[in-house]
UniProtKB/Swiss-Prot annotation:
Keywords from the UniProt entry: Cytoplasm, Elongation factor, Protein biosynthesis
Domain of life: Bacteria
Biological function: Associates with the EF-Tu.GDP complex and induces the exchange of GDP to GTP. It remains bound to the aminoacyl-tRNA.EF-Tu.GTP complex up to the GTP hydrolysis stage on the ribosome.
GO CC annotation terms, alphabetical: cytoplasm
PROSITE patterns: EF_TS_2
UniProt-annotated stretches for the region Involved in Mg(2+) ion dislocation from EF-Tu: 80-83
Cited InterPro entries: EF-Ts_dimer_sf, Transl_elong_EFTs/EF1B, Transl_elong_EFTs/EF1B_dimer, Transl_elong_Ts_CS, UBA-like_sf
Protein name in the entry: Elongation factor Ts
Family designation: Belongs to the EF-Ts family.
One protein family per Pfam: EF_TS
MF (Gene Ontology): translation elongation factor activity
Length: 307
């Protein structure tokens, strides 16, 4: 068997970016055959991807792609903030969102099956994702995407890599860009009060009613007069209407000029916003939190069991 030299290990590491000792083991197992060693590492990297698949991915990036009146917005998740700055991870995210815009996949499974190669992995986007899991050592996943091709003009805004907005509009592009920035900052849930989901309205009405009941209980305990049912009903409805104004885009005070609402700004610029989409990284994902001491203890326990 040919001697395994440091230069051979370095060459294999340069091709695969695998840990040094794994490269040495692969070369030893392959008896110095570089091609076979690379294949062995591909298998090992794939097994790493399988082990990582169950881990929570609450970090990540939002990325967008716009070309004429077609665009896409995508969330790609990973386990730690550190990986969000990795060039290979970012290249995967940017390539994927472009593929969405250009190929119109029906769902995440169709997206994963699209042809794509990167960093020696392929021939599909899913193969690259799995390969990078092994290479980087963290789970990563495509969480959600939306493609825009309604014929409306598009304006997008990314706040760093954690918040992404796409606005579908007719009219002034600068005004639409300002609206996208406003959405990122103020996070409305609907265009108008009428568009706010019924379950959110019901929840807010329930909160307002509970607050009114609590106030009545406090007043009774203090020997003070309790408000009439009519006044209480008006208070509850007033609270709901206040909430609707706070969460509907058109009724919000414009973030760049709080003397006017977004609706007033749009009217002044001759712009119509037809829809907006807001993505925030990790929204709705329960993030696993462990203190460092507990993490070290868990690793030591796992190592002891393995030995």
């Amino acid at each position: 068997m040919a001697a395994i030299t440091a230069s051979m290990v370095a060459e294999l590491r340069g091709k695969t970016d695998a840990p040094m000792m794994e490269c040495k083991r692969a070369l030893t197992e392959a008896q110095g055959d570089m091609v076979k060693a690379e294949e062995l590492l591909r298998v090992k990297l794939g097994s790493k991807a399988g082990k990582a698949a169950g881990r929570i991915t609450a970090e990540g990036v939002i990325t967008s792609y716009m070309e004429a009146d077609v665009g896409a917005l995508l969330e790609v998740n990973c386990e730690t903030d550190f990986v969000t700055k990795n060039d290979s991870f970012l290249a995967l995210a940017n390539a994927a969102v472009k593929l969405i815009a250009q190929n119109n996949p029906a769902d995440l499974a169709a997206l994963a099956a699209l042809p794509y190669t990167q960093d020696g992995f392929g021939p599909t986007l899913e193969d690259v994702r799995k390969g990078l899991i092994g290479k980087i050592g963290e789970n990563m996943s495509f969480r959600r995407f939306k493609r825009f091709a309604s014929g409306a003009k598009l304006a997008s805004y990314l706040h760093g890599t954690r918040i992404g907005v796409v606005v579908e509009f007719d009219g002034d592009a600068t005004a639409a860009k300002d609206v996208a920035m406003h959405v990122a900052a103020m996070k409305p849930v609907a265009l108008s009060s009428d568009d706010v989901p019924a379950e959110l309205v019901a929840r807010e009405r329930s909160v307002a009613a509970a607050k009114a009941a609590e106030d009545a209980s406090v007043a009774t305990a203090a020997g003070k007069p309790v408000q009439s049912a009519e006044i209480v009903a008006k208070r509850i409805e007033g609270g709901v209407q206040k909430y609707l104004k706070e969460v509907s885009l058109f009724n919000q005070s414009f973030v760049k000029n709080d003397k006017q609402t977004v609706e007033q700004m749009l009217k002044a610029t001759g712009t119509t916003v037809k829809a907006f989409t807001l993505y925030v990284v990790g929204e709705g994902i329960e993030k696993k939190v462990e203190d460092f001491a507990a993490e070290v203890a868990a690793q030591m326990a796992a190592a002891k069991q393995a030995s």
